[in-house]
């Protein structure tokens, strides 16, 4: 069983003191690689809830690891309609796409107050040249992200509203449980119904009705910004979604 996530929301001054690494949810790393990551890291930063971390089509030359808090990746249309691409949780690596595109391909907004480790984008070349195992880790993270996008594309294209909401609840619960952020079946759930609607391509009214229906079936409860899943097997069957995050993943 993983230990709980760090009680402090402030990034530690040294990577050796990283509370995320102590949870057991992330892959072990060699001492020399950890030293390189600490040298690679240019600093830390915080963002208030609602702040924009990355602007669409505006490169900022930075990469991030989310240490504490929730955020989301999104794209907007010219008329202001927004699609949430995925939710970002502690340990997620952020900003890699802008290395391979002319500017950030998406925006990132903080849902809660966030703490992040900051890395210079130009340092990736040295990482790949001198630490190929870390380069493999970044490739693995990119491939994992692609798999999550595939699941969301399937959700948007083929799952109905009930299946979509059930899938999202299971997906977020599994990810948080893996990093020790589930307690007695409860997880923090700071997203609102508009976030859910924008992530699943549903109207706000349809989202509200679907959440209410699943609650009436005794499958979940949401209270004071927290979510409890009451029957995960039933939600998995409804969503036809059985993905389980790997026990350990790379962490930069």
Task: Please report, for each region that a protein language model flagged, where it lies by residue.
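Short aromatic/basic micro-patch
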Residues: 44, 63, 87, 118, ...
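Cyclic nucleotide-binding regulatory domains
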Residues: 25, 36, 51-113
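Well-ordered beta-strand positions
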Residues: 46, 64-65, 109, 221, ...
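Phosphate-/nucleic-acid-contacting segments
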Residues: 174-252
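Polybasic "coupling" helices that flank or enter modular domains
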Residues: 133-201
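Cyclic-nucleotide recognition modules
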Residues: 86-151
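Cyclic nucleotide-binding regulatory module and flanking cytosolic helices
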Residues: 1-49, 93-94, 99-100
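Alpha-helix/helix-capping structural signal
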Residues: 68, 122-123, 194, 233
């Amino acid at each position: 069983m993983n230990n709980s996530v760090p009680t402090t929301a402030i990034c530690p001054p040294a990577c050796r003191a990283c509370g995320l690494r102590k949870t057991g949810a992330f892959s072990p790393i060699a001492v020399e690689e950890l030293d390189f990551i600490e040298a690679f890291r240019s600093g830390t930063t915080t963002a208030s809830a609602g702040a924009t971390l990355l602007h669409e089509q505006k490169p900022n030359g930075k990469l991030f690891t989310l240490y504490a808090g929730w955020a989301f990746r999104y794209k907007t249309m010219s008329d202001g309609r927004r699609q949430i691409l995925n939710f970002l949780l502690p340990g997620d690596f952020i900003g890699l796409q802008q290395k391979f595109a002319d500017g950030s391909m998406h925006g990132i907004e903080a849902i809660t107050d966030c703490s992040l480790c900051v890395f210079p984008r130009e340092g990736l070349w040295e990482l790949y040249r001198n630490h190929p195992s870390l380069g493999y880790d970044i490739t693995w993270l990119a491939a994992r992200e692609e798999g999550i996008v595939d699941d969301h594309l399937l959700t948007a294209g083929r799952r109905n509203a009930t299946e979509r909401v059930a899938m999202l609840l299971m997906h977020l619960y599994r990810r948080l449980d893996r990093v020790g952020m589930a307690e007695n079946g409860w997880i923090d759930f700071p997203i609102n119904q508009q976030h859910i609607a924008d992530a699943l391509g549903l109207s706000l009214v349809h989202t509200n009705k679907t959440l209410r229906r699943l609650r009436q079936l005794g499958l979940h409860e949401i209270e004071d910004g927290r979510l409890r899943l009451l029957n995960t097997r039933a939600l998995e069957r409804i969503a036809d979604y059985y993905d389980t995050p790997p026990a350990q993943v790379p962490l930069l």
